[in-house]
């Protein structure tokens, strides 16, 4: 399994496509027993393993050079559903659309139904195991990260043993595994707490950042469940990073949902993406017109979180843009206290204009404090600011992007904020420690639970080298 293969494989992430990695083999276990066998064999042969699901992770945490990839996409069953508690046990490779479809079928005709509370937005074919590893969030207005939705999990540790983890059993390991980026064990099953499935109505307005911030507490107090603020991206606009579409979702009594509601087609999305690269003002105009026209439409609280993701959408864009090289969008997510958001966004706008940052898309979401995980990114209640930046796949352009991302982290730190660790590897050591003072302890715990460092990733290797003086 671990010997050098004559036909080594090259894997890459789906979105940024900047993590091409040569690996020796890819295994696709379909049972927990097969995962245990793979880890046991890796220990015998002395090779390293990494774990992937939907392959959207873009910071290097799902691949390891010259290692063996465990692709959990075949470990995808819904094992048990408890309609009384509203809990579901699933295998880690199941992806959101499949989970939601199975829940819908199992509950067809029931007067009380359950659905997922939150998922990542912008893409759907993401695994539950990956959601656990990254401790993801959605667009809930009053929700903590995904750890709040996890009742328990089973993992295969680095020694090949099956271990049950919850807040009551192996609690320290539970805290490390959720948001632990696959370094403390291979999650094979998880029990999730669902929420009552209910209808919501979309309410949309164009407003300023200040108006959105003022309205947010009122929306939460009134029981609105979800929402976000999608801001203008044209740097020559007076509304750049300041004016946007504020969409919220309010629970309503169940009624038949119109079959012909407005929606953006794949062709609409491809056109919007093209405009976002060449005419950002027009892209926002069309996007905001669509959202305003959809005001008042009804959705289900779970399925409204699904979205269209166009696989390899940038191949067509590369031809249209004719820049002579491949390109993609790279994501960063920054967190600041809500009271600092206006100053933070103004500083980002000035920086983007000064450095000619090519911003394609951005949104503001909200998160409640995570007091449970060891490497919590939501160390307090935050506004979450997501920027998608265009990157040409050229060394100079990537170096320029790295500078952009580091400056953004510095701006977040200036306003008592933080950043998400694994969208890119460009943070400095000082930035890591400023935002994650527990990082060295996290890495030390990794080596305590996995002294052979059987489970690795290029992300882990990068930070092991960065913190080599602090680690044994």
Q: What are the language-model segments listed below?
A:
Residues 2-17:
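N-terminal regions that are enriched for targeting/export leaders
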Residues 18-121, 135-140, 364:
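Glycine-rich N-terminal segment of FAD-binding domains in flavoprotein oxidoreductases
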Residues 34-37, 98, 212-213, 240, ...:
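Short, conserved charged micro-motifs
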Residues 83, 127, 157:
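Short, acidic, Ser/Thr-enriched surface-loop or helix-capping motifs
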Residues 151-343, 350:
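C-terminal substrate-binding/cap subdomain adjacent to the FAD-binding core in PCMH-type
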Residues 304-427, 431-434:
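Substrate-recognition/cap regions that form aromatic- and gly/pro-loop-enriched pockets
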Residues 318-319, 406, 413-472:
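Activity-critical C-terminal alpha-helical subdomain
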């Amino acid at each position: 399994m671990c010997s050098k293969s004559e036909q080594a494989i090259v894997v890459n992430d789906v979105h940024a496509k900047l993590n091409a990695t040569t690996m020796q083999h890819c295994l696709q276990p379909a049972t927990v027993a097969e995962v245990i066998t793979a880890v046991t064999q890796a220990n015998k042969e002395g090779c390293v393993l990494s774990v992937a699901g939907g392959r959207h992770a873009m910071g290097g945490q799902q691949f390891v050079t010259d290692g063996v990839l465990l692709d959990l996409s075949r470990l995808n069953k819904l094992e048990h559903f408890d309609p009384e508690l509203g809990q579901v046990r699933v295998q880690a490779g199941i992806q959101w659309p499949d989970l939601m479809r199975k829940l819908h079928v199992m509950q067809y005709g029931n007067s009380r139904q359950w659905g997922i509370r939150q998922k990542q937005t912008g893409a759907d074919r993401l695994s539950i195991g990956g959601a656990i590893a990254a401790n993801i969030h959605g667009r809930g207005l009053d929700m903590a990260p995904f750890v709040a939705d996890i009742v328990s999990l089973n993992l295969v540790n680095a020694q090949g043993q099956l271990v049950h983890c919850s807040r009551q059993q192996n609690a320290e390991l539970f805290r490390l595994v959720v948001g632990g980026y696959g370094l403390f064990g291979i999650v094979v099953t998880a029990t999730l707490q669902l929420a009552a499935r209910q209808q919501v109505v979309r309410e949309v307005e164009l407003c300023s950042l200040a108006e959105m911030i003022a309205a947010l507490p009122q929306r939460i107090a009134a029981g609105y469940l979800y929402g976000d603020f999608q801001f203008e991206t044209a740097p020559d606009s007076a509304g750049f990073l300041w004016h946007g579409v504020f969409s919220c979702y309010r629970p309503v009594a169940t009624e038949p949902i119109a079959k012909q509601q407005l929606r953006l087609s794949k062709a609409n999305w491809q056109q919007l993406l093209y405009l976002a690269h060449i005419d950002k003002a027009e892209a926002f105009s069309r996007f905001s017109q669509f959202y305003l026209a959809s005001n008042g439409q009804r959705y289900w609280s779970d399925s409204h979180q699904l979205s269209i993701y166009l696989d390899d959408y940038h191949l067509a864009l590369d031809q249209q843009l004719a820049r002579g090289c491949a390109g993609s969008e790279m994501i960063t997510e920054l967190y600041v206290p809500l009271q600092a958001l206006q100053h933070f966004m103004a500083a980002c706008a000035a920086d983007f204009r000064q450095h000619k940052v090519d911003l394609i898309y951005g949104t503001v979401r909200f998160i409640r404090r995570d007091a449970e995980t060891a490497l919590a990114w939501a160390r307090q209640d935050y506004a979450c600011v997501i920027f998608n930046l265009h990157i040409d796949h050229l060394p100079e352009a990537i170096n320029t992007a790295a500078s952009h991302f580091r400056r953004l982290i510095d701006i977040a730190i200036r306003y008592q904020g933080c950043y998400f660790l694994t969208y890119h590897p460009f943070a400095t050591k000082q930035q890591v420690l400023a935002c994650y003072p527990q990082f060295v302890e996290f890495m030390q715990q990794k080596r305590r639970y996995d002294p052979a460092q059987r489970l690795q990733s290029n992300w882990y290797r990068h930070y092991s080298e960065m913190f080599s003086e602090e680690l044994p």
